[in-house]
């Protein structure tokens, strides 16, 4: 049985996109064991991704910060496995060194530093036709196996206890269809315009559905609190009400997610939840790598498109109609 190490200590969306690599490794080596090194805040993303057997939490802003923290992490995990191969996302140099120290027989990564590349089993990577980030992650499996990778959907398995919380507590007594609204991003200029959000909420309500605002963090709280008090009463406020697995269960309860945030959008797609992406700053050409692949149920409204509430709602209705017809 082969044992693999996948290292990605990046953020929410980056982590979930790595599942394309994990699923390809499991497709090629069904009996293998896959260990995923994850950034601490996103451990519950990697833990329930399809193909992941075990998660090691890297607390890069806490006990594993800096070189001393890196060495502590190494000592915590040395000699646990003999890794047949390690796959280091974004060519992270600490991840490459860790893989070497842990004794990985082969290491695959996209890193162009002349010295670091001496540690890798691959040369400069020619991705050929693969443009999307998730496919480029998965291509590392092809380099190791010598067999073609498949472009496939990312998947996340929501644990039963998360569904129990959503169904028995958070959404208890709610029977109307829910439309998720995720307006807040890491940059204010990318956030869904408040006027657009409120216009959408009204359209959702008029259609007999419930507009639910989701998200986490102080910025999401501030966004909601800064809405006019009378208007925000239309929204079901679910900000900071869930853990990551519970958010997964909540998204599964939504007919559609309307999202300005890429990470949450990718998460919804991993759950097979239809998504309307609203990206103000990037056009479709710029999103060729990071935007959703065609096999996901989604609509993309990018720079140069129609960002009116009417158009966003039309795209939402189209997705709902397509889902009903399936």
Model region roles, listed by residue range:
Residues 1-326:
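Catalytic machinery of carbohydrate-active enzymes
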